[in-house]
Amino acid sequence: MATGGGRAFAWQVFPPMPTCRVYGTVAFQDGHLLVLGGCGRAGLPLDTAETLDMASHTWVALAPLPTARAGAAAVVLGKQVLVVGGVDEGQSPVAAVEAFLADEGRWERRATLPQAAMGVATVERDGMVYALGGMGPDTAPQAQVRVYEPRRDCWLSLPSMPTPCYGASTFLHGNKIYVLGGRQGKLPVTAFEAFDLEARTWTRHPSLPSRRAFAGCAMAEGSVFSLGGLQQPGPHNFYSRPHFVNTVEMFDLEHGSWTKLPRSLRMRDKRADFVVGSLGDHVVAIGGLGNQPCPLGSVEGFGLARRRWEALPAMPTARCSCSSLQAGPRLFAIGGVAQGPSQAVEALCLRDGV
């Protein structure tokens, strides 16, 4: 493990993936890290599927995806991994839904999405898969909400989101799915909405205070954080084009309001397109793009108790556009872009947890 500042944290470096990729789909199942599809050096979606055995630290090639795709969503359902949507080799959104059967090492096709979509957000609850939003073949953002019933192998429609979007951040908290941000074409969305799984109704919460693309979002201790990103030009700032910011905005779920933290509590680095998550009592920001000519390797954490940012151990491999996944005490940064698509697989860990 690499060590440095932030004594509670360290990096665990795993063997590189056999295939370099960006926009890969990742899942963690029974001690195995699965990396599916994505884009390789040629810039085209892959059908390659690989898994890392966390015990032996060895990679194994899996049966290829029936549909080559990048930017798909994945949900673990027991011994299966369901892959939903994405973009295909023709740069068109995908309707295909496929399941990898881990015990049998093979893929099965499942009921397709009612409408092809990329940038779908997925959430699993009680064995059901909820797919929210996306962008269709006509490039219009979608408001559809669908739920997949594995036993019947079918998708059912639920009340649509108030705000169509794709690429949104989603969080499951209690009996509600929270949907934050996303995009409509090139424009970032500021909407923050919640779907009640029992009442099957939507609630609009106050919108994000600022409009930013490629921000990082996380939930920790009853609050939702929106960090950094590319600030969009607007009537209330003097920038004529998007610029990197270190903004920190926090929504208190109990009180139902946003707080834009003061300058003294902003992130140490301005960044966008980075990995974000919650480890222990810290909200963590990893890598990304900033004002430098190459991806950032810096890492920082916001201590929820001390309410301040501190430097954490830097990434062993500086990258942006990583696929990320949180599994127990590890926050993975997988693939992404260094000087091109990367093979790196690294995890920021809580020292006491590994």
Swiss-Prot record:
Kelch repeats lie at residues 1-31, 32-79, 81-127, 128-175, 176-222, 224-281, 282-329, 331-354. It is found in: Cytoplasm; Midbody. One of its GO terms (biological process) is mitotic cytokinetic process. The keyword Manganese does not apply. Disulfide bonds: none annotated. GO terms for cellular component: cellularization cleavage furrow; cytoplasm; intercellular bridge; midbody. It comes from the Eukaryota. Keywords: Cell cycle, Cell division, Cytoplasm, Kelch repeat, Repeat. PANTHER family: KELCH DOMAIN-CONTAINING PROTEIN 8B (PTHR46260:SF2), RING-TYPE DOMAIN-CONTAINING PROTEIN (PTHR46260). Involved in pinching off the separated nuclei at the cleavage furrow and in cytokinesis. Required for mitotic integrity and maintenance of chromosomal stability. Protects cells against mitotic errors, centrosomal amplification, micronucleus formation and aneuploidy. Plays a key role of midbody function involving abscission of the daughter cells during cytokinesis and appropriate chromosomal and nuclear segregation into the daughter cells. This is Kelch domain-containing protein 8B. It comes from Bos taurus (Bovine).
